[in-house]
C-alpha cells in the first residue's frame, strides 16, 4: 500500500500539535496505520540589529529571533484518509508538505 509522508512546519508549536492531533483522529477514524508525529530539529533564525539609527554613541545591539518547528507524520495513503487530510483546517502560520511513496 502507498504511504504518505506529511511534513508540518510552523513558528507556533501549539498550532503544530493541534494539526497533529487532527491527523491522529483521522487515522483512528479511518483505521489506517500512522507513525509520528516525529519532532525534527528546530531551526533558529537570529537577526542582530543596532539600536541606534545614526551610528553615534555606544554600540548596543538587539537580537531578534524566530524559531521554526517541524514535525513529520507518516500515514497510509488510503483514499478516504487522504481526502480527510486535505480537508484539515490549517492555521495561517503552519505549512504542510505531503509526499506520496509506494
UniProtKB/Swiss-Prot annotation:
Entry GO terms, CC: small ribosomal subunit
Database matches in SUPFAM superfamilies: Ribosomal protein S10
MF GO annotations: structural constituent of ribosome; tRNA binding
Biological process, per Gene Ontology: translation
Alphabetical list of Pfam families matching this protein: Ribosomal_S10
Keywords of this entry: Ribonucleoprotein, Ribosomal protein
Domain of life, source organism: Archaea
PANTHER family in alphabetical order: 30S RIBOSOMAL PROTEIN S10 FAMILY MEMBER (PTHR11700)
Function: Involved in the binding of tRNA to the ribosomes.
Complex and partners: Part of the 30S ribosomal subunit.
Identification of the protein by name: Small ribosomal subunit protein uS10
Organism of origin: Methanothermobacter thermautotrophicus (strain ATCC 29096 / DSM 1053 / JCM 10044 / NBRC 100330 / Delta H) (Methanobacterium thermoautotrophicum)
Gene that specifies this protein: rps10
Amino acid at each position: 500500500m502507498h504511504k504518505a509522508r506529511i511534513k508540518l512546519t510552523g513558528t507556533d508549536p501549539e498550532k503544530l500539535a493541534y494539526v497533529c492531533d487532527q491527523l491522529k483522529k483521522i487515522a483512528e477514524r479511518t483505521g489506517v496505520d500512522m507513525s509520528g508525529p516525529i519532532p525534527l530539529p528546530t531551526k533558529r533564525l537570529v537577526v542582530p540589529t543596532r539600536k541606534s539609527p545614526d551610528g553615534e554613541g555606544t554600540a548596543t545591539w538587539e537580537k531578534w529571533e524566530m524559531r521554526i518547528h517541524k514535525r513529520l507524520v507518516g500515514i497510509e495513503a488510503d483514499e478516504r484518509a487522504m481526502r480527510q487530510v486535505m480537508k484539515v483546517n490549517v492555521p495561517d502560520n503552519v505549512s504542510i508538505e505531503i509526499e506520496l511513496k509506494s
